[in-house]
Amino acid sequence: MSFFTQLCSMDKKYWISLAVLSVTVLISALLKKRATETEDIVVVHYDGEKLNFVLRQPRLNMVSYTSFLRRVCNAFSVMPDKASLKLNGVTLKDGSLSDQNVQNGSELELELPKLSPAMQQIEAYIDELQQDLVPKIEAFCQSSPASAQDVQDLHTRLSETLLARMIKLDAVNVEDDPEARLKRKEAIRLSQQYLSKLDSTKNQNK
């Protein structure tokens, strides 16, 4: 029996199954190609991390620098005020991304300005306050003390610790740094709120 005769003698169901499989594979390939053609991906690096940003609607040629920067900063949980994006070392400007040679597959760098020495000290103060003292203050305000003396002792210890740190904060030189001066005011205001909270709890437990 010839090869052609063997083919003709094959079950009709086999040919139908083969045809269905071929069509399925073809459709899958077309859909995958279409999906690729209808989306752009831009990679952004920041602080050792890398995120892929998929752009479908609107497409890359319709996306502005400002809106994309806002999306990137939100994903990395940073403030967009002074952040910037760079492509091959060149800082991007407001306007269309595609007009600045950002293409599908481009890799960008998210950069934030370096903090001044004064800002670094103030940020360190706030971090230490939030991570170290605030949990202790909150625990003091929510606990049921054994005696009025316990309240007094713990209040004194926490208040003196906070005041000592505020004195160091006040010594930070912000004379030529308006931004640091404003940030220090915010830190002092926050600290005073916790001092008031300590005093209020002490007075309630007299």
Curated annotation (Swiss-Prot):
SMART domains: BAG. The modification Phosphoserine is found at residue 144. Signal peptide: none annotated. One of its GO terms (cellular component) is cytoplasm. Keywords: Chaperone, Phosphoprotein. Pfam families: BAG. GO terms for biological process: nuclear protein quality control by the ubiquitin-proteasome system; protein folding; protein stabilization. The keyword Phosphoprotein applies. GO terms for molecular function: adenyl-nucleotide exchange factor activity; protein-folding chaperone binding. Residues 122-202 form the BAG domain. The keyword Isomerase does not apply. SUPFAM superfamilies: BAG domain (SSF63491). Binds to the ATPase domain of HSP70/HSC chaperones. Inhibits the chaperone activity of HSP70/HSC70 by promoting substrate release. This is BAG family molecular chaperone regulator 1B.
